[in-house]
């Protein structure tokens, strides 16, 4: 019997991130649905600011810059950073650098 151990990536808000290439974003009135075709996982984004940040991550050098561009003040970033960290743990987001791409 073979078991695969997925490499656990730790979210660092000071590095580049992007959507996994197998993730589709479907806009919804409440925010968006993310569907990972590789893992068949579904995530609900219930905040339009989070949707904006997730969609723009690849355009910014790091997650904090994406949050600032979306109008999230430094002292308001904690819940957004937590949400991005959860998306990293579920493999919806991956490092933006070529070495970490999947």
UniProtKB/Swiss-Prot annotation:
Phenotype upon gene inactivation:
Cells lacking this gene lose the ability to utilize ethanol as the sole growth substrate.
InterPro entries in alphabetical order = MftB (IPR023850)
State the family named in the UniProt similarity comment for this chain: Belongs to the peptide chaperone MftB family.
Q: What does this protein do?
A: Peptide chaperone involved in the biosynthesis of the enzyme cofactor mycofactocin (MFT). Binds MftA and MftC with high affinity, and is essential for MftC activity on MftA, likely via the formation of a ternary complex. Is required for the in vivo ethanol assimilation in M.smegmatis.
Protein name stated in the entry: Peptide chaperone MftB
Q: Which organism is it from?
A: Mycolicibacterium smegmatis (strain ATCC 700084 / mc(2)155) (Mycobacterium smegmatis)
């Amino acid at each position: 019997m073979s078991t695969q151990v997925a490499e656990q990536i730790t979210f660092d808000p000071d590095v580049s991130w992007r959507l996994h290439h197998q993730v589709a974003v479907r806009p919804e009135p409440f925010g968006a649905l993310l569907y990972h075709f590789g893992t068949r996982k579904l995530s609900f984004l219930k905040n339009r600011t989070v949707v904006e940040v997730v969609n723009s991550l690849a355009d910014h050098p790091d997650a904090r810059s994406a949050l600032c561009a979306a109008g999230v003040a430094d002292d308001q970033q904690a819940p957004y950073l937590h949400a991005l960290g959860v998306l990293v743990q579920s493999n919806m987001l991956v490092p933006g650098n070529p070495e970490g791409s999947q």
